[in-house]
Structure formats: structure tokens, C-alpha cells
């Protein structure tokens, strides 16, 4: 009976995205450009917020935390996907597969809490401006960050707990380009229908629940601003619209996946590419182009880098 707790499958084989050479080439260029842009954009945001005194505020602290998470989000699956595009045998070790699942759920959990924290930050800024710095103190910001990481890691460990007593002794082919927990459960030697249902409900409930919390909070904020509208609110509303855009980009793909009655493998792959490559790229774009202070800070950072290169 001891063998039931040990996997005899040492690696998993990915079917990948497509067998078309032309589409693979397009995906290689598309994914590589967006990956480099995502890394560069998010590093610029983290560096700008860290070094520029003009951005030392709660809102930008949370934004830098989100960009740090996005650095991980675009690095968990994208590099291997790009590396495997033209490989005939796309494999990942059992440990590598578990690591992918762990980090995917950690990053997803942390990002959800950070988006809630950013919504709360905008609520305080717009509805209680006189108490903003008192409520959104450094201690409060660090508490948000600690809660985000605690819940993210806890959620991921809870998801992985489903795999503890499962044996993988036969098929090892995943119709994907990364390790997805529901697909991995289907490869187990035992009946995992209930486990698949629990995993889907757990992730779907958290995703949909968080989305509606954010939706209600943004509607409440907009209603409050509309009641006390003034010219000084335009800047805050612009920031709020940027937050709303990021929320839609983040929750759109997973909500579509978890709420559909009939999953579609090709559609899931497309949404996974969107989630893994495009969303981390669009986040810094949305926040940068819609925020004058952030654009000014990035320009100052670029000037400093140019001066540093000239000196060196």
C-alpha cells in the first residue's frame, strides 16, 4: 500500500499550443516581445516607486507590490512556453509541475488581495480624503501586504493538498503548455471527479467572489464621488478607471474558464496565453499611460540611467 503515496510518473508531456509552424513563429515573436516588455515595464514601476520620493505614498506602494507580483506572473509559465514552442518533445518534471501549480496559485491569491487593497485605498482617498494618510498608514500598507502573501500561500497549499495521496502511474500527457491542477488531477490513477469539482469550485468561488467585492466597491466609490463631484476628483477618478481596467483584465479569463459549463481546450489555451503574457504587460501600460506622476517618474529614471551610462 505504500506505493499508493508515491508517483511512478517522473515527468509530464505537454501537447503545446499548435503544430502549425507559422503560428508557432507568430507566438514566438508575440510572446517574446510581450515577455521582455512585461519584465521591463514592471521593473521600471518597482524601481521608480522605490527611488522617487514623489511616489512614496500608499497608492504607489501597492502599485509597486502589484508590479512585483506581475514579474512572477509572467515568469512562471511564459519562459518555458517560449522555450518549448519548436521542441518536438515538450516535457516538465513532476517537481517542476508541482512548482508551477504552487506559484500560479500563490501569485493569483496575492494579486486578488492586492487588488482589494488598492480598491480600499481609492475608497479612502475619494470618500475620506482628510483621513487618508491616517488610515492608509505605512503599518496598514504592510499589513495588507502580509495578509496578501499569507492568504496566497495558504490558498496554494490548500490546492496542492489535493495531490498528497494521489498516485500517477499511467498517462502523463497534458493538453496544455503548462501544469494546470484540474488537468493534472485527471491523470491520476484513481477517480478524481469529486476532487476536480472541489478544486474548480474553490478557485471559481474565490475568483468570482473577489470580482464582485471589487465591482461593488467601485460602484459605491463612483456613486459617492458623483454625489460630491468636484474638479479635484478628476485625478482620482482617472486612477480609479485604471484600477477598474486592470481588474477586468485580471478576472476576465479565469472567470470565463471556471464558469463555463463545457470547457474547450483550445479556448482555455488562448485564455491562458492572455493571462500569462498579455495581462502582466498591460498592467504597467495601463498605470503608466493613465498616470502623469508615474510617467514623470519613469522619465526621471530614464534620464538618471542615461547620465549614469555617460559617466561610466
UniProtKB/Swiss-Prot annotation:
The chain crosses the membrane at residues 26-49, 58-79, 101-120, 140-158, 196-219, 236-258, 270-289. It is a multi-pass membrane protein. The keyword Glycoprotein applies. GO terms for molecular function: G protein-coupled receptor activity; olfactory receptor activity. Disulfide bonds join 97-189. It holds the Pfam family 7tm_4. It is found in: Cell membrane. One of its GO terms (cellular component) is plasma membrane. Glycans are attached at residue 5. Its main location: membrane. Residues 50-57, 121-139, 220-235, 290-312 are cytoplasmic. Keywords: Cell membrane, Disulfide bond, G-protein coupled receptor, Glycoprotein, Membrane, Olfaction, Receptor, Sensory transduction, Transducer, Transmembrane, Transmembrane helix. Odorant receptor. Belongs to the G-protein coupled receptor 1 family. This is Olfactory receptor 4F21. It comes from Homo sapiens.
